[in-house]
Amino acid sequence: ALLFCLVLLVACVSGDSNVEQLAPGVVYHKIHLLEGPWWIHVIEVDLPEAWAAGVRLRTAMGHSERGGVQKTSSLAAGALAGINGDYLYTSKTSHTAGLQIAAGSLIRTPQRQSAFAISGAGKPLIAVYQMELGVLTAGGEDLRAQGFNREPSSKELVVYNHYAQVWHDSVHAARGFLLQGLHGESTINDTVITRVQQVRRRAWPLFLEPGQWLLAAGAEYDASSSIAPGDTVRLYCRLPPAHDKMVEAVGGGPRILRDGAISIEVEKERLSRTFADERHPRTAIGYSQNGQVLFLIAVDGRQPGHSVGMSLQELAEFMRMRLADFSFAKENAYQGLNLDGGGSTTMVVGDQVVNSPSDPTGERPVANAL
C-alpha cells in the first residue's frame, strides 16, 4: 500500500506525456500536469542534429493587401510544426509589433521588447535588439538611416526594402535612390554591395523586387553630393548585441529566463504586471545553456477543468525546472522568452492544430508565426 501511494504521488506531481518524433532532432511532447491542471505542448529541437538533417527554423508573416493576419495553421502549412509569434499592432494597417526577419531580410524593426533570433548556423539568441542601418558611399562616407519602411521626415534618410509595399503603395520624399544588389542577399549583420540605378523625386509608385532597396531622403537631407547614379554603395544593417548573420527573428516579450534564472522583465520592457501575474494561455520559446536544444511551447488556458493557463512566473518555473523531466536531451531552458498568448496561442504539428485555442470561435488569426 505504501509503494502504491508513492507511485501515485509521483504521477500526480510529475504528470505524463505523449511523444512523437517529427524528424531527426525534432520531437513533439504533449504534457499533462494535474496540479494546474495544465496541458502543455512542446516542440523540442536538437539544433545540431536537426540542422544536419536539413531542418530549418523559419518565420512567416500574415499577408493581405494591407499587412494582415492569418491563422497559424495557414502560416505553418507544409512545415513539420509551428507556433504563433509576436503581438499584433493595428493602426491603418496590421502588422507584427516587434522585430521580424525572414530569410535574412528585415521586415519590421526591433522595439523595446525582447526578440528571438537565430543565425544561419542555428545559433539562437534572445535579446532586446538595436538597429544600425545605412550605406557606405563610394567616397567612404557613412550615411546612417533614421528609419525603415516608412516615409522620412524633412531631415531623415529612410531605407525601404521589398517588404515595404505590403504597407505602402507609394513613396513621398524629396529624393529617392534606387539600389540594385550586386553581391549578397542578407543585410543582417552584413553588408550588401549595390549600385545606384536611378534617382527619383517627390512622389512615385513603390515597387521593389527582392534584392532592391530604396534610400528616401527628406527635403532637408542633402545626399546629392554623396550618391549619384552608377555609384557602388554598401548597404548595411546591424542588430547589436548579435554579431552573427541572423537569418530569422520574431519579437515577443517579456523575457522570462535570463542565464538560468527566472527574470520576469515586464517593467524593463514596459509591459503590464497584471498581464504577467494572471493565468492565460501562453506561447514561449527558449533554449538550453549550451544553445543546442530549442523549445517551442504552447500552454492551453482559460478552460477550467482542462487547462487553466499560466502566469509568467509559472511558465518560467516550468521551463527552468521541469522541462528536463520530459526532454529527450534532459535539458531545461536557460534563456526564455514569452510570445503572444491568450487566444493567439496555437501549436500546429503536421498541418493539424494540436492544442486547444481558447477563443470560442477557435483558432485566432495572428501577425506571424515560427
Feature roles, as predicted:
Residues A1-V10:
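Bacterial N-terminal signal peptides
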Residues C12-L370:
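Gly/Ser/Thr/Pro-rich low-complexity, intrinsically disordered segments
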